[in-house]
């Protein structure tokens, strides 16, 4: 990566050997020291003009000590990958194209830290990122170029949206100066995906890129999880900007339940003779399988699940009635007709489950 390095400190600066020869390359090294220790920024010089100014460097090592912080000047593609590393990303899925070539150049340089899974088609890449998120509990990341590459992601993004899967889709686009001019392979992918994303961005300034990526990951994982799209014009991926590493923001806790609501639920559970518990995909996404098992045992309830909720409760348990709804089991249909209390956990009540609202769980509270 070609970057400029700036080391900031309110403490004493002691340059040591500003330039020295190392083989056929020059090594730049500055040390900054105080009572807390020494911070050293070391870099290869890849280009120096005749006046020895305005050079760019290849980072070898930066050691940060207490009292110091280091700001690197990276291009947009490198900032993007550094932000992915901040979020704990080590695997991305995608298919290359003209508008994301700078990102793929950076991926090659970061190949020891981030694994790229190449698919035959962008739609496959998006579904793979979605599946990766489901199986790993992490945020899926997919990369596609502008135009047809971006539109090929739509089905995968919509799937993640409907199933509440955390996904960050990164698309390239034409340079900022060509946006809105019907340029080659330009589409309004932000507008196209607006109905099937939690949020989306068009990053027109490289200085906004890092915080945009961080916010995208936060939104994808906060509350009801889902996909977020970041559209990055090609020139933004090449422009240089200062970058400072930041720790991910902690995800805010969910909705606070009022005491009177808890008391109402307890009263209903105590009164119930034939409780029925219906589990959905939220049980799996929140890793609440053990809590659900404990709850069911204490209530002595029978259990059914949605399609997304399968695996949230042990299907070999005698309390498990199978799936509920249009494609569910006869056992679950009979049990819900007979129950006197219906408890839904981590689910939405889709038309495939409710069918006819007037006859759904007719004897239940």
Where are these regions (language model features)?
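Intrinsically disordered, low-complexity regions of eukaryotic proteins
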Residues: 15, 42, 53-55, 66, ...
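N-terminal alpha/beta PP-like core and its mobile active-site loop of ThDP/TPP-dependent enzymes
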Residues: 69-365
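N-terminal amphipathic/hydrophobic targeting modules at extreme N-termini
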Residues: 7-8, 14-20, 26, 32, ...
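Residues marking helix boundaries in flexible regions
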Residues: 20, 60-63, 69, 267
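N-terminal low-complexity/intrinsically disordered extensions
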Residues: 24, 28, 64, 68-72
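Compositionally biased low-complexity segments enriched in histidine and/or tyrosine
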Residues: 2-6
């Amino acid at each position: 990566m070609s970057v400029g390095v700036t080391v900031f400190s309110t403490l004493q600066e002691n340059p040591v050997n500003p330039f020295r020869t190392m083989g056929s390359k020059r090594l730049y090294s500055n040390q900054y020291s105080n009572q807390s220790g020494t911070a050293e920024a070391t870099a290869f010089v890849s280009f120096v003009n005749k006046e020895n100014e305005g050079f760019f460097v290849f980072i070898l090592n930066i050691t940060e000590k207490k009292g110091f912080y280091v700001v690197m000047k990276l291009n947009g593609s490198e900032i993007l990958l550094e932000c992915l590393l901040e979020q704990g990303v080590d695997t991305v899925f995608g298919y290359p194209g003209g508008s994301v070539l700078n990102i793929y150049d950076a991926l090659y340089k970061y190949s020891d830290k981030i694994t790229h899974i190449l698919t035959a088609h962008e739609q496959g890449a998006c579904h793979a990122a979605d599946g990766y998120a489901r199986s790993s509990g992490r945020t899926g990341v997919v990369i596609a170029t502008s135009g047809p590459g971006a539109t090929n992601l739509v089905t995968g993004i919509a799937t993640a949206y409907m199933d509440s899967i955390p996904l960050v889709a990164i698309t390239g686009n034409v340079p900022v100066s060509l946006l809105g001019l019907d340029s080659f392979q330009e589409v309004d992918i932000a507008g196209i995906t607006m109905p099937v994303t939690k949020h989306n961005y068009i990053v027109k300034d490289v200085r906004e890129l890092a915080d945009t990526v961080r916010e995208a990951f936060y939104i994808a994982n906060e509350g009801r999880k889902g996909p977020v799209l970041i559209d990055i014009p090609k020139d933004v991926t090449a422009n240089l900007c200062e970058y400072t590493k930041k720790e991910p923001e902690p995800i805010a806790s969910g909705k606070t339940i009022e005491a009177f609501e808890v008391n109402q639920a307890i009263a209903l559970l105590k009164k119930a003779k034939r409780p029925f518990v219906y589990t959905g995909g939220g049980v799996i996404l929140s890793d609440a399988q053990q809590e659900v098992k404990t709850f069911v045992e204490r209530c002595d309830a029978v259990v059914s699940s949605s399609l997304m909720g399968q695996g949230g409760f042990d299907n070999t348990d005698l309390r498990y009635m199978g799936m509920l709804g249009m494609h569910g089991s006869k056992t679950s249909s009979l049990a819900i007709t007979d129950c006197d209390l219906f408890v839904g956990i981590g689910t939405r009540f889709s038309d495939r489950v409710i069918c006819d609202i007037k006859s759904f769980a007719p004897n239940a509270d």
